[in-house]
Amino acid sequence: VRIVALWAFLALLTGCQQQNREELVLWHAYRGAEATALTSAVRRFEASADGVKVRLVSVPYDAFANKLSVAIPRGNGPDVFIYAHDRIGDWAARGLLEPLGLWANESLIDQFFLQTVESLVYEDALYGLPLAFKTLALFYDKTLVDVAPRTTAEMVAQAKAIRAADASRWGLAYPLDSLYFHAPWLHGFGGQVYSKGDEPALAAAPAVRSVAFTRRLVHEEKIIPEEVTSALVTSLFRDRKLAFVVNGPWFRGELEGHDKWAVAPLPIVSETGIPARPFLGVEGVLLSAQSLRKADGYALMRFLTRTDEAKTRLSSGGQLVANQAAYVKGAGDAFTEAFRQQVEQAVPLSNRPHMRRIWTPAQDALSQAIMHGVPPAEALQEAVRLIKRGD
């Protein structure tokens, strides 16, 4: 009875508030094919909904978070918006997001990769539905590598053989001082960013071992250049001077003119038997707590994430979608399949509000330990000290 009454209240509330806003407002930061695919999906929603209209507003990604944080409390923000999950903790704590407990159920949740749903949970409440995901995988040059390595030992052996045959070529490259790119090894050695007690764990033994591993690849195995930039990685790989690259799906857009490459899940860390596990970033579709049309907003969210729409975004928008049923085994391309496999071994990037404190100290620690000879334990202990201090 209470549920029926609540739905009746929502319907009445929606009907009254439509006088104040005659259309749903959806904010996004998509461009190109992704924006086109979203627009088409929204028009299909309008055609299927009873008189519901949606106004799409494109907001530059760099300004999105700040603009949203100001607009929602003032009552002039969107009803629904699409954004990366890492700000959910901050926005939920400030009361900007509507939790989906009223609507979400097990059959709905089971549509998606579990890790993508976990990314949208903060303090046991679900705050959005997952649209798409991004993570890292292993790109390799097929003119240099016949078969993707299953373990890090195999990867190192292949890389060393390539270097021995031609010293102008390198085995592996990625931004060495980036925690985002180091995360596969951190997790593969059994480490984590925060402990279960919510304490920074970057100075724990597994984290120290992961940094020592990277330093060995640079200075002892000599398969990674000492100075690595994103531009250098792209240049070396396109010139076929690089065997392996740790990178995300966006890297494909930089490989025009190079068609002899492939991508595979990251290897198992030989020292631990644990797969290298990259961070997982999720683009969720979220509902504003200040929306005057929550029921209609949620209907739009459900529509955008359903299987047929996910298949369309996967094929025409080029997105790695979170809906599992959109992937037909054996029917997709190898690129998509590699990232579909990788998501199952990915670690959701923390959505804690204080996660943002960790990036700069971690970057400094990785730089000091890998490129400047500071002992890994010492560099990571300093990072933890700065994180706890709030620097």
Regions found by a protein language model. Name each.
Residues A264, L314-D364, Q368:
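Long, aromatic- and glycine/proline-rich binding clefts that accommodate carbohydrate-like moieties
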Residues R216-P225, E256-Q319, V347, D364, ...:
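Extracytoplasmic/periplasmic substrate-recognition and gating elements
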Residues I3, L10-D90, S270-G273, T312, ...:
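Conserved N-terminal structural module of periplasmic/extracytoplasmic solute-binding proteins
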Residues Y83-A137, T152-Q158, P184, A262-P265, ...:
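Hinge/lid segment of periplasmic solute-binding proteins
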Residues G101-F112, G191-S210, I268-P278, V328-K329, ...:
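Short, solvent-exposed loop/beta-turn-alpha elements that line the ligand-binding surface or hinge
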Residues S58-K67, D86, T152-E154, P225-D239:
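Short helix-initiation/N-cap motifs at beta->coil->alpha
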Residues Y127-L131, L136, E154-P200, P206, ...:
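Extracytoplasmic/periplasmic solute-binding protein
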